[in-house]
Amino acid sequence: MAGRSGDSDDQLLLAVRLIKILYQSNPYPKPNGSRQARRNRRRRWRARQNQIDSISERIPSSCLGRPAEPVPLQLPPIERLRLDCSEDCGNSGTQGVGDPQISGEPCMVLGAGTKE
Protein backbone atom coordinates (compact mmCIF):
# COMPACT_ATOMS: atom_id res chain seq x y z
CA MET A 1 0.00 0.00 0.00
CA ALA A 2 2.50 2.46 -1.27
CA GLY A 3 2.04 6.15 -0.69
CA ARG A 4 -0.05 5.84 2.46
CA SER A 5 0.83 6.26 6.08
CA GLY A 6 1.16 3.21 8.29
CA ASP A 7 -1.71 4.35 10.49
CA SER A 8 -4.25 4.24 7.66
CA ASP A 9 -2.86 0.83 6.63
CA ASP A 10 -3.53 -0.44 10.14
CA GLN A 11 -7.05 0.99 10.04
CA LEU A 12 -7.67 -0.62 6.65
CA LEU A 13 -6.47 -4.00 7.90
CA LEU A 14 -8.67 -3.64 10.98
CA ALA A 15 -11.70 -2.85 8.80
CA VAL A 16 -10.99 -5.89 6.60
CA ARG A 17 -10.63 -8.13 9.67
CA LEU A 18 -13.92 -6.85 11.11
CA ILE A 19 -15.78 -7.52 7.86
CA LYS A 20 -14.22 -10.99 7.58
CA ILE A 21 -15.25 -11.85 11.16
CA LEU A 22 -18.81 -10.68 10.45
CA TYR A 23 -19.18 -12.91 7.40
CA GLN A 24 -17.56 -15.90 9.14
CA SER A 25 -19.97 -15.56 12.06
CA ASN A 26 -22.92 -16.46 9.81
CA PRO A 27 -22.23 -19.81 8.10
CA TYR A 28 -24.71 -21.28 5.64
CA PRO A 29 -27.26 -23.52 7.43
CA LYS A 30 -26.92 -27.30 7.47
CA PRO A 31 -29.14 -29.21 5.01
CA ASN A 32 -30.86 -31.45 7.57
CA GLY A 33 -34.40 -31.51 8.90
CA SER A 34 -37.74 -31.15 7.18
CA ARG A 35 -38.28 -28.99 4.12
CA GLN A 36 -40.04 -26.34 6.19
CA ALA A 37 -37.25 -26.29 8.80
CA ARG A 38 -34.61 -25.92 6.06
CA ARG A 39 -36.63 -23.13 4.44
CA ASN A 40 -36.94 -21.29 7.77
CA ARG A 41 -33.22 -21.64 8.48
CA ARG A 42 -32.34 -20.30 5.01
CA ARG A 43 -34.79 -17.41 5.45
CA ARG A 44 -33.26 -16.47 8.80
CA TRP A 45 -29.75 -16.87 7.32
CA ARG A 46 -30.63 -14.51 4.44
CA ALA A 47 -32.00 -11.93 6.89
CA ARG A 48 -28.80 -12.10 8.96
CA GLN A 49 -26.72 -11.93 5.76
CA ASN A 50 -28.56 -8.76 4.69
CA GLN A 51 -27.84 -7.20 8.08
CA ILE A 52 -24.16 -8.15 7.77
CA ASP A 53 -24.07 -6.66 4.26
CA SER A 54 -25.43 -3.33 5.49
CA ILE A 55 -23.06 -3.26 8.48
CA SER A 56 -20.04 -4.16 6.35
CA GLU A 57 -20.86 -1.31 3.96
CA ARG A 58 -20.71 1.16 6.86
CA ILE A 59 -17.43 -0.12 8.37
CA PRO A 60 -15.00 1.47 5.86
CA SER A 61 -16.61 4.89 6.16
CA SER A 62 -16.55 4.80 9.96
CA CYS A 63 -13.08 3.26 10.40
CA LEU A 64 -11.31 5.00 7.53
CA GLY A 65 -13.36 8.16 7.17
CA ARG A 66 -13.98 7.56 3.45
CA PRO A 67 -16.65 5.82 1.40
CA ALA A 68 -16.29 2.13 0.62
CA GLU A 69 -16.74 2.51 -3.12
CA PRO A 70 -14.21 4.29 -5.34
CA VAL A 71 -15.08 7.27 -7.50
CA PRO A 72 -16.83 5.99 -10.64
CA LEU A 73 -14.71 5.88 -13.78
CA GLN A 74 -15.98 8.07 -16.61
CA LEU A 75 -16.25 6.01 -19.80
CA PRO A 76 -16.90 7.28 -23.32
CA PRO A 77 -20.28 6.50 -24.92
CA ILE A 78 -20.56 2.88 -26.07
CA GLU A 79 -21.41 4.02 -29.60
CA ARG A 80 -17.88 5.41 -29.96
CA LEU A 81 -16.13 2.20 -28.86
CA ARG A 82 -15.19 -0.48 -31.37
CA LEU A 83 -12.65 -3.19 -32.11
CA ASP A 84 -9.95 -2.15 -34.56
CA CYS A 85 -9.55 -4.84 -37.23
CA SER A 86 -6.41 -3.25 -38.66
CA GLU A 87 -4.34 -4.00 -35.54
CA ASP A 88 -2.62 -7.35 -35.02
CA CYS A 89 -4.85 -9.06 -32.46
CA GLY A 90 -2.23 -11.73 -31.68
CA ASN A 91 0.21 -9.23 -30.22
CA SER A 92 0.10 -9.27 -26.43
CA GLY A 93 2.10 -6.05 -26.08
CA THR A 94 0.80 -2.66 -25.12
CA GLN A 95 -0.41 -1.57 -28.56
CA GLY A 96 -3.48 0.59 -28.29
CA VAL A 97 -3.58 0.62 -24.49
CA GLY A 98 -5.24 3.77 -23.22
CA ASP A 99 -6.08 4.90 -26.76
CA PRO A 100 -9.67 4.05 -27.69
CA GLN A 101 -10.09 3.34 -31.38
CA ILE A 102 -12.81 5.66 -32.65
CA SER A 103 -13.97 5.62 -36.24
CA GLY A 104 -17.02 6.58 -38.23
CA GLU A 105 -17.33 3.24 -40.05
CA PRO A 106 -18.22 -0.06 -38.35
CA CYS A 107 -15.76 -2.93 -38.30
CA MET A 108 -16.96 -6.24 -39.75
CA VAL A 109 -15.85 -8.80 -37.18
CA LEU A 110 -18.65 -11.36 -37.26
CA GLY A 111 -19.95 -10.92 -40.78
CA ALA A 112 -23.34 -9.88 -42.09
CA GLY A 113 -25.32 -12.05 -39.67
CA THR A 114 -27.61 -13.64 -42.27
CA LYS A 115 -28.29 -17.39 -42.32
CA GLU A 116 -27.90 -19.40 -45.50
From Swiss-Prot:
The modification Phosphoserine is found at residues 5, 8, 92. HIV-1 lineages are divided in three main groups, M (for Major), O (for Outlier), and N (for New, or Non-M, Non-O). The vast majority of strains found worldwide belong to the group M. Group O seems to be endemic to and largely confined to Cameroon and neighboring countries in West Central Africa, where these viruses represent a small minority of HIV-1 strains. The group N is represented by a limited number of isolates from Cameroonian persons. The group M is further subdivided in 9 clades or subtypes (A to D, F to H, J and K). Residues 26-50, 91-116 are annotated as: Disordered. Its main location: host cell. GO terms for cellular component: host cell cytoplasm; host cell nucleolus. Keywords: AIDS, Host cytoplasm, Host nucleus, Host-virus interaction, Methylation, mRNA transport, Phosphoprotein, RNA-binding, Transport. InterPro entries: REV_protein (IPR000625). Homomultimer; when bound to the RRE. Multimeric assembly is essential for activity and may involve XPO1. Binds to human KPNB1, XPO1, TNPO1, RANBP5 and IPO7. Interacts with the viral Integrase. Interacts with human KHDRBS1. Interacts with human NAP1; this interaction decreases Rev multimerization and stimulates its activity. Interacts with human DEAD-box helicases DDX3 and DDX24; these interactions may serve for viral RNA export to the cytoplasm and packaging, respectively. Asymmetrically arginine dimethylated at one site by host PRMT6. Methylation impairs the RNA-binding activity and export of viral RNA from the nucleus to the cytoplasm. It comes from the Viruses. The keyword RNA-binding applies. A motif (Nuclear export signal and binding to XPO1) lies at residues 73-84. GO terms for biological process: mRNA transport; viral process. Escorts unspliced or incompletely spliced viral pre-mRNAs (late transcripts) out of the nucleus of infected cells. These pre-mRNAs carry a recognition sequence called Rev responsive element (RRE) located in the env gene, that is not present in fully spliced viral mRNAs (early transcripts). This function is essential since most viral proteins are translated from unspliced or partially spliced pre-mRNAs which cannot exit the nucleus by the pathway used by fully processed cellular mRNAs. Rev itself is translated from a fully spliced mRNA that readily exits the nucleus. This is Protein Rev. Belongs to the HIV-1 REV protein family. It comes from Human immunodeficiency virus type 1 group M subtype J (isolate SE9280).
